Amino acid sequence: FQLSTRPMLLVRDDLYVKHVNRVMVTIDGTGVGDDALRTACELVREIPGGTLTGVHVVRQESAPSRGGRTKADEVLDAAVQRARGFGVDMKAIHTEGKDIGRSVCLAASECNADLVVIASQDRRPLVARGLVDLDKLLGGSVSDYIRVHAPAPVLLVREPEQG
């Protein structure tokens, strides 16, 4: 699945979800993160009574600006507005944790998510993108932690192919 540029649904063998009503999406303020938000909004719009929760995790709380708002507040506010633009009301959660993957999984448990939508960027140089990413292969990425430990199926949204 590392080389796919299409969204992929990843379901652990021990998970069973009869209905998807509560969708949680990770918010990171990146372009591929915006793609994940768009995908989550499109899904929730088609679910009668569906709800969307956006979670933004920071490793360390940043200092508020003059207006008393942090960068995390700005990222979440922009995501809420973007979701509204897709016709979806999104509940926003801001959390702090040294281990982002673990914090995302904890948030998914707390909001009782039926589906977790995450973005996964390929940070390798363009010349290496056709090759296997050893960090992901060995399970060293945030998205891999979430994929393995999330309490719900994970919809992995990859960045579109450049070209």
Predicted segments with their positions:
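Charged docking surfaces used in two-component/phosphorelay signaling
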Residues: 95-103
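Small/aliphatic-rich secondary-structure junction motif
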Residues: 18-69, 80-93, 113, 149, ...
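Gly/Ser-rich helix-loop-strand patches that form or flank binding pockets
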Residues: 1-16, 110-163
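Structural motif
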Residues: 11, 94-95
